[in-house]
Every structure is written in C-alpha cells, then in structure tokens.
C-alpha cells in the first residue's frame, strides 16, 4: 500500500480514495468492532507508514545494485529533514542498504514497520506499536544510525519497511502539533 501511494505521489496525484466496510468481514483497512472499538488491518499500517514518510516534497532517489525486491522513496521536509522510505517486498531475503548522502552527517532515526508474516492480521507494528482499539497510535521505539563517511547503513528485513529520517524531526512525531495521535477517521 505505501509503495503504491508513493508511486502515485511521484506521478503528482494529489489524493487517493480506498473503499472498505465497517464490518470486519472481507478486505478493509479498518473495521468497527461490536464492542465499540476499531481493528486495523495491514493495509491501514501501509497508509500510516506513508503518512509518516510523505511529509514534504517528493525528491528523486537513485538506486544502484540488485538483490532483494526493495523499493525506496525520498521526501524533503519543510524543516530540512530528509525522509527515506525503504520497503523490502522480498519474502525471504533481507536487504542491506547503504544510503549515500555526502552532504549530510550525524544521526538518523529509523522507525520500522513489522509483522509476524506477510499475511498477518494481528501483531503488526509501526515504530514498535500497534494501533489501539480506540484508533490511536503512538510509536514506542526508534533506532539511531550514524553516518559513516556520508553513508547511512541500514538493514531492512524481508517483508518489512523502514523509515529513515535524517535531520530535524524524529519519525512518529505528529504532522499537526494539535493532533496528538494518528487514528482512523
């Protein structure tokens, strides 16, 4: 889902509508539970990952090498941060990535999208946290990666994604300071 949304953003598409239902049968991004809460599906986590990654202007990312079925997308934030979304669609192979940014230095924050299996319906996390039954989400964990001679090394496990933020903002901070969390609406 996130990869598709990035493809559309890179083509200049300004909005996307996804269809679903509020019952928990069939395929939907999230559904309303009978007890009044929400249950989100994998598709929703892809949209949430995109929301965290796509805060700014899409910029070109050049890829070299081969190996895992890995895609990458980059966004330059208004605050000067560079957000690099790495999506490993390979079901078996981890991807070792070296992001070359000779003009940047210092620490980068990494937030990961993980699931126990590619078709998981539960235990999916972004930033070490799942979306709560009330629809709120607040990341619990990020990693730090230091540049080594202008290169940020990162490993992206099979069937997972990582958001690397170099610069002013940590991944998982609200897009709008008045909005303390991200939740389905």
Give names to the regions the model predicted:
Residues 104-152:
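Acidic, Ser/Thr/Pro-rich beta/coil linker or hinge segments at domain junctions
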